[in-house]
Amino acid sequence: MILMHDITRDGNPVLRQVAKPLTFPLADEYKELADEMMQYLINSQDPKIAEKHQLRAGVGLAAPQVGKSIQMAALLVPNDKGEIIFKEVFVNPKIISESVRKACLAEGEGCLSVDKDIEGYVPRPDKLKIHYYTVDGEEKTIRLKDYPAIVASHEIDHLNGHLFYDRINKQNPFDLAEDTIVIS
């Protein structure tokens, strides 16, 4: 079971590396890691389990965040009612197209690997088309928009050595392009 002490923190070089692609069939250790990463997200979104194990809630977890520089990320995205609207483990994901229009979260973003609050809007594409493989090696292409697209972009950034605050405007953290969608 992944706990908060297992989460790699900002400053660790693994978070700034471009993660290595995986080959199929996946080794058992990577399948187990995928299961553990998804289970962390499930547990962290359950108030009783999260409190018992002092877990910070998460909607995504990339392998570099648990010290593994591999192209794998788990996503468990709820809607505003707490119902899961997207659940998947990406292996070797690639963004193959993205919208010109940007979106951001009204409250900004956080990250399990970043312990301090960093204020500012994090503009990301409002829509993404992503090519990836499942843990079983099934090839998929999906389209995401709004909140799920933001979460996917955040996790894929981790696989490319980027953290959310890299996208914040350093001179004016709350400056946005006119047509940016602000999601509350």
UniProtKB/Swiss-Prot annotation:
The active site is at 155. One of its GO terms (biological process) is co-translational protein modification. Keywords: Hydrolase, Iron, Metal-binding, Protein biosynthesis. PANTHER family: PEPTIDE DEFORMYLASE, PEPTIDE DEFORMYLASE 2. InterPro entries: Peptide_deformylase, Peptide_deformylase_sf. The lineage of its organism: Bacteria, Bacillati, Bacillota, Bacilli, Lactobacillales. Belongs to the polypeptide deformylase family. Coiled coil: none annotated. Pfam families: Pep_deformylase (PF01327). Its cofactor is Fe(2+). Disulfide bonds: none annotated. It is an enzyme of class 3 (hydrolase). The gene is def. Removes the formyl group from the N-terminal Met of newly synthesized proteins. Requires at least a dipeptide for an efficient rate of reaction. N-terminal L-methionine is a prerequisite for activity but the enzyme has broad specificity at other positions. This is Peptide deformylase. It comes from Lactobacillus gasseri (strain ATCC 33323 / DSM 20243 / BCRC 14619 / CIP 102991 / JCM 1131 / KCTC 3163 / NCIMB 11718 / NCTC 13722 / AM63). Its EC number is 3.5.1.88. Binds 1 Fe(2+) ion. One of its GO terms (molecular function) is peptide deformylase activity. It catalyses: N-terminal N-formyl-L-methionyl-[peptide] + H2O = N-terminal L-methionyl-[peptide] + formate. Fe cation binds at residues 111, 154, 158.
